[in-house]
Amino acid sequence: YLCNFSVFQSLLDHWALDQLFPIMPIHRLEVPPSREGTLVDITCDSDGKVDQFIDFEDSRNTLPLHEVPTDEHGKLLHDYYLGFFLMGAYQDIMGDLHNLFGRVNEVHVFLDPDEPCGYYVEEIIQGTTVGAALASVQYDQHELKRRMKRQVDRAIKADLMKPTEGRRLLRDYDAGLSGYTYLSA
């Protein structure tokens, strides 16, 4: 399964030391998994894979997963979520900004039998934006936007672009800078 994360960024000790972390589907829990699979990430180095998983008594080479429905063109009909557990701050700090992906979205969930659903969400931490990742390597997003606007204005003035196209391009550029560094639907 191709996953929207970086093993080196988020599971550094798995990559470097073969440490195993609990991983399981957190989506479609009412349906038993029907497939076995391994996980690969979206990074360019082809080194981001998880092919060892915690089992009841030992480890295993595959993870029980669900089939993910697609349309007739192979496009996913809905997202499929996996939980990576017990990673902690050390993994975040050591992974730093590898590949400029930055931090993934994170949810801190605690089990509590006194809660109606048996758990509560303590905190939701949003992942790194493209603008924040670029800022970490000294690119100012306001300056990038200013330069893009100048290029669009020149293209419009030279009749290479229509004003509506220019506005759409600038809107999309701004949305890209404020968007998540990982893939989004």
Regions found by a protein language model. Name each.
Residues 1-185:
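Charged (often Lys/Glu-rich) extended helix/loop segments that serve as interaction or gating elements
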